[in-house]
Regions:
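Extended, charge-rich alpha-helical interface modules
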Residues: 2-234
Length: 234
């Protein structure tokens, strides 16, 4: 074994140290997520493409939820995806419904929460400096400015660096434990410690996607794919 590889137990220990410093309730016996060797890292191009697709869907979902989605909006989104990034065929089934304007109002509202999963992808790409304590929504203006900044996939690729998988796994372990805290608080009325469950859940979803390459639910064209329907048990 490579002695430089951090074990799942070590990640758990680091997370618990953080939770203790933040006065966030936790349980010692919550299982691990992954050992490093269990995970196939996603490449930078794949993460960028997912970020671009998610961004376009979120923008359309925001318009739908306000009752303002137009044919011009749809054409603009499709051109953004096909002409600027060539990723139109990489949309998930739910994203396809959003951009087609056929998703329900409730579905569109849920789709807007993907902002937090997208925030995680931009963190993984080094654009977002850190994943701060999940009690406030992400900087939506920064996301929009970022997506407006790049001229296309090559430009995006040239100006970003994917974080090491060890760093991503550490963030996943911490948010997994945050998620347990929020679920326990919702069910049993225990201390929430200032956490926002929706933010925690969506950020964890983004981190889970970064770590589930090659798994059964990794095919984005499937209706139960890991982006639209992440497995978030605690």
């Amino acid at each position: 074994m490579n002695n430089n590889v951090i074990t799942a137990q070590e990640r758990k220990n680091r997370s618990i140290t953080i939770l203790q410093a933040q006065n966030v309730p936790y349980i010692e016996h919550l299982p691990f997520r992954y050992e490093t060797e269990e995970v196939t890292p996603r490449d930078k191009k794949e993460v960028i493409e997912r970020a671009v697709c998610s961004f376009a869907s979120i923008m359309c979902a925001l318009s739908i939820s306000k009752g303002e989605y137009s044919q011009e909006d749809r054409v603009y989104a499709e051109d953004f995806l096909s002409e600027k990034y060539n990723v139109l065929e990489l949309l998930t089934p739910m994203e396809q419904q959003v951009i087609a304007g056929t998703i329900s109002e409730a579905g569109a509202m849920n789709a807007t929460w993907k902002y937090e999963s997208l925030w995680v992808l931009l963190w993984a790409l080094g654009i977002v400096e850190e994943l701060s304590f999940p009690n406030e929504i992400c900087d939506c203006d920064l996301i929009m400015d970022t997506m407006d900044e790049f001229e296309g996939l090559d430009d995006f690729m040239a100006h970003t660096t994917l974080r090491p998988i060890e760093e991503i796994l550490q963030a996943l372990d911490l948010h997994y434990r945050y998620h347990w805290t929020t679920v326990n608080a919702r069910i049993y009325g225990s201390d929430l410690a200032g956490l926002d469950e929706d933010i925690v859940m969506e950020r964890r979803a983004g981190l889970e996607w970064l770590c589930c390459k090659g798994q059964e639910n990794d095919n984005l064209t499937d209706s139960d794919n890991a982006w639209d329907h992440p497995e978030l048990g605690t």
